[in-house]
Amino acid sequence: MMPSTLSLCLMLAGLCSLVTSHLTEEIQASNDTENEYSSTRRISPYMTDFSIDFYRLLVSKSNTTNIFFSPISIYTAFTLLALGAKSATRDQILTGLRFNRTEISEEHIFEGFQQLLNTFNLPENELQLTTSNGLFIDKNLKLVAKFLEDSKRLYASDTFSTNFEDNMAAKKQINDYVEKETQGKIVDLIQNLDSNVVFVLVNCIFFKGKWEKPFMTELTTECPFHVDSKTTVPVQTMRRLGMFNVFYDQDLSCWVLKMKYMGNATALFILPDTGKIEKVENALNKMLFHKWTRNLKRRAISLYFPKVSISGNYDLKILRELGITDVFGSNADLSGITEETNLKLSQAVHKAVVNIDEKGTEASGATFAEGIPMSIPPTVEFLRPFIFIILEENTKSVLFMGKVMNPTGN
């Protein structure tokens, strides 16, 4: 017998593993590429808006801690949820994800995500970039056939029958799925399940990026990272003298460094001058990213970059502050998921892990040389708090975003 109130649980896991590199000049996408990814590029500006708003929301909770999350993971899970939401619940989800409904139709939103996920999971992709969606359904719960069909067609979702009456077995089944999909990097995502849960939706994203040109491991040395004016922590720091795409923003007092991965992903690392990080955070928007990208110049610098190991673990009920409210309470209308009228989202958890180090590089044994101007290059030391954003270039999608306040994760 079903309980009087049914709960849906949303779990999101993201892993980003990076190995060191340098930057190459940005290449303009061809018309063919523009057309090939047109559906996804239609939704990417809204995803960028959401990424920045969610970042600011996390900063408002604590401006002294590391931040790391996967906007694409959150986006994928909640648009999948929107497939089965109706009326105000659906409107709130799509508006909270920053879609402007006067500019883009629901058809184009879901079409864009279908193309996006297909692009990520291509076997010939040089990047190790995969996403997965798991639907864990109580063995006694009957889902609406259209929701199952659409989630499979648009999101390639896996469906599992689950006995939620056996709480421990259900947790193990779901955690084993997450561990497998993140290649063992995220374990025990679910610590507890509400007793009345009958449906769990899990999204996983796994990304391992290899930089085009590696740092030399023998140059890595310990340096002090300045957490704040009173605190430093020792951190293993990679060093490289070379040609990089960089820009110093005089208006915001920050360095911008673009790093290119093998394949179609890039990262922007933003290093504010001491005491200027809040100024930069307040200025973040799409136009600022465009300004930085336009002004990047290839030049010689002496780069110091710390090894990073941080994670983020977030209760996504904070999305209420972005206007997504009904789905979490008694007003939820998820009648497109199940014919039961009392289904609500009781738990929504997102965990993401990032490691930036020298492990796993396949560039060992390769030789690389480049010309450096005779003049003394500037030194750029990422040895104080910095912001970063990782994008998939073809689709212009934000994969990960974060802030490093302490690269050791403490």
Swiss-Prot record:
Domain of life of the native organism: Eukaryota
Glycosylation site list: N63, N100, N264
Any GO BP annotation: acute-phase response
Family matches, as InterPro entries: Serpin_dom, Serpin_fam, Serpin_sf, Serpin_sf_1, Serpin_sf_2
Molecular functions per Gene Ontology: serine-type endopeptidase inhibitor activity
PANTHER family named among the record's database cross-references: ALPHA-1-ANTITRYPSIN (PTHR11461:SF165), SERINE PROTEASE INHIBITOR, SERPIN (PTHR11461)
UniProt comment concerning the protein's domains: The reactive center loop (RCL) extends out from the body of the protein and directs binding to the target protease. The protease cleaves the serpin at the reactive site within the RCL, establishing a covalent linkage between the carboxyl group of the serpin reactive site and the serine hydroxyl of the protease. The resulting inactive serpin-protease complex is highly stable.
Record-given protein name: Alpha-1-antiproteinase
